[in-house]
Amino acid sequence: MSPVEESPEEFLARFAAHRVEVRLYPEPWGSPLLEVQTPAGFVYAMDRGAPPAPVGEARVLFHGLARKVARAQGKEGVFREGAAYRLVGTARPLEKGFYLLLARGLPVVVHWEGPMPEEGEVLLWPPLMLFRE
């Protein structure tokens, strides 16, 4: 299996077309976890950018590693389950091993080695990751 990313900068450049406008909220200095207001509501994501994280409007890329993938059973959305997120939405392939899952207006680049249904339900491994410039 090849690495999922070469570097945060390379990953962001590779999938930059799938960034989304969000609002970042202040976190304690040095905290890697960001509180983010997205089109789908608030999420917590691990910041893959250099400190300090900006506050306010930003264009960011969300990325997650899929633990389980199934055909969508519930309503579309982004649901927190402990430290993990369950995404339910529309998926489309980007390149080998990567899909774009759109859940209530929130695009997330998901890594999954197998096939993903067009209407998918994905349980991510924690953490949900956020890439920014």
Predicted regions, residues:
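A short linear-motif detector with a strong N-terminal bias
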Residues: 1-2, 13-15, 38-40, 70, ...
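Structural detector for short beta-strands of small beta-barrel domains
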Residues: 2-28, 76-97, 122-124
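OB-fold (S1/OB) nucleic-acid-binding surfaces
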Residues: 25-43, 93-109
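Acidic (E/D-rich), amphipathic helical modules within compact regulatory domains
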Residues: 28-74
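Noncatalytic linker/hinge segments flanking ATPase motor cores
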Residues: 63-66, 75-78, 127-132
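Short, solvent-exposed interaction modules
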Residues: 68-117
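Mixed-charge, glycine-accented linear interaction segment located at domain edges/termini
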Residues: 107-133
